[in-house]
């Protein structure tokens, strides 16, 4: 999610004008991400982003009608990188298909990213505004993500990697509730919280393992990890489609 980690999605061939427009979009999104880290969502204006990107304010508005739309696109570009990281980790280590390990690794990766950290953990105003914007514009992407998570959990249940004393829906809700709680608490300096982010991530995994995994869980196979990785890889196509739909 860091600067230039997610260049604007391109299709070949491109005209010179189209290539120039996409390069300009890259600069705008990089600038918005940098300013978000430095100043926070409330202080950043479209004019600030334009100045940082070296273009006119009107040019930014050609691509993004509102500040919320701009930062939602920053989030969307970052989300593509997040999903890509999940896929890579699953292919490198089959244990990453387990909800606790997957969430632990994601937590550590996002905390280490200077742009993702304020979006996911710190800037409540930004999250609130983007949630409202996303409700109106990212419905299909959200629905696909939920469908994918359910398929992921069903594969794990079929392989004996998740307990079956709770319904799949209950387990999915539990994952979301535990994850949201840990992420929300990152905005507070609780005296009981471990100082090391890795230790906080380990506690998140501990909670999910205790709640979701059977005591006699087998080891996830490479074959299963590839099937689950392909599920998440398919989400990247949906992200790309949403990108092309919303970016002018």
Where in the sequence are the language-model features?
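Amphipathic alpha-helical packing segments from all-alpha helical-bundle domains
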Residues: 83, 130-161, 166-184
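Amphipathic alpha-helical segments that line or abut small-molecule/effector binding pockets
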Residues: 30, 96-114, 173, 198-209
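Hydrophobic alpha-helical connector segments
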Residues: 73, 87-118, 122, 136-137
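Helix-turn-helix
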Residues: 27, 35, 39-69, 73
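Generic hydrophobic, amphipathic alpha-helix propensity
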Residues: 21-32, 49, 74-82, 86, ...
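Short amphipathic alpha-helical elements of helix-turn-helix/winged-helix folds
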Residues: 31-35, 109, 178
């Amino acid at each position: 999610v860091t600067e230039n980690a997610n260049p604007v999605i391109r299709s070949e061939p491109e005209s010179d004008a189209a290539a120039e427009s996409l390069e300009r979009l890259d600069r705008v999104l990089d600038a918005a991400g940098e300013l978000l880290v430095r100043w926070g969502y409330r202080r950043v204006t479209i004019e600030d982003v334009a100045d940082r990107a070296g273009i006119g304010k009107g040019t930014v508005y050609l691509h993004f009608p509102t500040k919320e739309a701009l930062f939602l696109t920053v989030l969307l570009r970052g989300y593509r990188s997040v999903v890509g990281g999940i896929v890579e980790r699953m292919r490198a280590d089959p244990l990453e298909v387990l909800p606790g390990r997957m969430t632990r690794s994601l937590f550590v990766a996002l905390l280490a990213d200077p742009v993702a950290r304020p979006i996911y953990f710190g800037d409540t105003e930004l999250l609130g505004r983007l949630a409202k914007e996303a409700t109106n514009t990212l419905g299909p992407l959200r629905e696909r993500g939920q469908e994918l998570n359910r398929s992921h959990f069903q594969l794990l249940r079929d392989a004996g990697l998740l307990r079956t004393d709770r319904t799949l829906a209950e387990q999915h809700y539990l994952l979301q509730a535990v994850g949201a709680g840990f992420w929300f608490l990152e905005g507070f300096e609780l005296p009981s919280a471990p100082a090391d982010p890795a230790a906080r991530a380990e506690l998140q995994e501990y909670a999910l393992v205790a709640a979701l995994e059977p005591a006699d869980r087998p080891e996830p196979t490479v074959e299963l990890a590839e099937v689950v990785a392909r599920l998440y890889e398919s989400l990247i196509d949906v992200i790309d489609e949403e990108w092309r739909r919303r970016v002018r």
